[in-house]
Amino acid sequence: MPDRLVSATLALRDDGTLVSPEFGELHRGASGTLARAHRTFVAGNGLPARWQRRRTFTIVTTAFGAGAGFLAAWAAWRDDPARCERLHVVAVEPHPFSRDDLHRAVSHMVVDTTISADVDALLDAWPILVPGLHRLEFDEGRVVLTLAFGDTIDLLKKLVARADAFFLDGAAASGDGIRALAKLAGEHATFATHAKSDDVKHALGETGFTFREVDDRLVGDYAPRWRARRHEPPRALPVAARRAIVIGAGLAGCAVVERLAARGWDVTLIERHERIASEASGNPAGVFHPLMTRDDNVASRLTRGGFLHALARWRALERAGHAFSRSTHGMLHLAESADDFARMRDAFDAFGPPSDYATLLDADAARAHLNLPVAQGGLLFPHGGAVWPAGLCVAQYAAAGERVRLLASTCVARLERRDDTWHALDDTGATLADAPVVVLANAGDAARLAGLRHVTLQPVRGQLTLLPPGTTAPLPCPAIGDGYAVPLDDGTLLIGATFEPDDTDPAMRAAGHAENLDRVRHLLPGLIGALPDPATLRGRVAFRWVVGDRLPLIGPLADETQATANARALGGAQARDLPRMPGLYGAFGFGSRGLVWAALGAELIASQLEGEPWPLERELADAVDPARFLIRALRARRVGSAG
């Protein structure tokens, strides 16, 4: 059963103090002031001096509340001409406010009108209240707030970050919380807190923190006398120049290009076709929605995180003038049977999502929503829908501006590493491009280029069908189930798609159109009227590459040769123990979920390269790690000398 996220509500005491009735003094920061937050947390951590002239600086705050600590840090950063290039704030909050209550709390707290624009930006970006990590960007991406909604101690154990400073408050001011923080602390990390109990001091001392009392607070440094951590927090990849090669210009590759360019990387994008988005990313539309399961499993959490992260990135692209075609009328996932609807209901009841994330509709409500007969109800995702993937790719490419160079109609025969530089070579051995970093986003060819033996990708043929305007009933939003139907802007209805594993025939088939028609007629019986011979219908064939566990492959690629040589020692390895090929990353195997996973995968890779906080929890990053199949083989003693 998933842990439900319970939001905090707000009440005003007679003395003017804002409190949360359900949780007592949980949000003490809501009734404080920015000046108090600055004195305690910002100045208490030696800021702004400590972040000056650095590329990035990371603050972990253990109780977001109404955002006093974050707003104080943001204001101090903006006022400092020697500020770091990029400020990260990772904020844990077990009981976040709704947007309306946050507005009330911040309005009560903030008297400094100079930051009113910051408050408005925070409220505008405030995420849907569902568990997990939510990444928000401000000041053109130079200030990044990663909100972690859920149990404080549990999330602190799952975060991946190298913290430079801690704003210690709330439930984390305890032994378990401080021990979790110590695993995130970088060299010379500092902390500040109002908590001064003997238990807090004991936990600080035993985990390597020094401390001293200053006025009404405790401050100190991470300065352990010994190194007892098996794994150090992540560091930036050391490179002589911030240059990268991205191979593959579909959804995965263009998302990576945009995220790297936003951080100041120069990127060479290599595409074997004449233009970007020429394969599956060239379909007229793709459906976009999360997944809900009763146990909120890894796939459910990954799709939720990817779905919400993509929405945020797309809105940022649109605000920057890089718009693309996407529907904004929601999407209805119809159950395929009574048992399927019961599973949907169980998942909905267990998760208890807010209505702006998902709503359960019975058959009558679904029928009224679509104005069409349906056999079953389903889940309505108000922010789901359909996206023109090629338009999204073009928007991301345009956002990269002068930092990207496209080599179209260019095939990479092999990769070669010399000294600290990767060379992409053609079939004559000539260098097409070179850089310290390569990201493989070229679907089925990625494993060949990287020489991966423990990654198996399967091609799946998908044929979609286009029904001419006037041949179908109006459909107010995309609908999916066993098949899908998507209304396009010109009145065409896109339906599909076939799922044909290991079939690599690119030719259009009348049988594929007939299959799509049968599936959608069952899904929405009143949608399709009389049609001509299926052999005369238009459509498109594309190939999706899927992994055995149906999860993508995102992150640094393993050095399988070195791992094989050390197989016996790596028999109990975790992902962090494996040797990696320096500067070689992958973003492939997305199957039919490229729209959901591409933006989050790109942000993960960019964060890994830069040594920034990761946008998803360790468990989820491990679940998409390209080395996961090698790890399983090592544990099963099926590799090298362990065999």
From Swiss-Prot:
Its cofactor is FAD. GO terms for biological process: methylation; tRNA wobble base modification. One of its GO terms (cellular component) is cytoplasm. Its EC number is 2.1.1.61, 1.5.-.-. It is found in: Cytoplasm. InterPro entries: FAD-dep_OxRdtase (IPR006076), FAD/NAD-bd_sf (IPR036188), MnmC-like_methylTransf (IPR008471), SAM-dependent_MTases_sf (IPR029063), tRNA_MAMT_biosynth_bifunc_MnmC (IPR023032), tRNA_S-uridine_synth_MnmC_C (IPR017610). PANTHER family: SARCOSINE DEHYDROGENASE-RELATED, TRNA 5-METHYLAMINOMETHYL-2-THIOURIDINE BIOSYNTHESIS BIFUNCTIONAL PROTEIN MNMC. In the N-terminal section; belongs to the methyltransferase superfamily. tRNA (mnm(5)s(2)U34)-methyltransferase family. In the C-terminal section; belongs to the DAO family. NCBIfam families: MnmC_Cterm, PRK01747.1-4. This is tRNA 5-methylaminomethyl-2-thiouridine biosynthesis bifunctional protein MnmC.
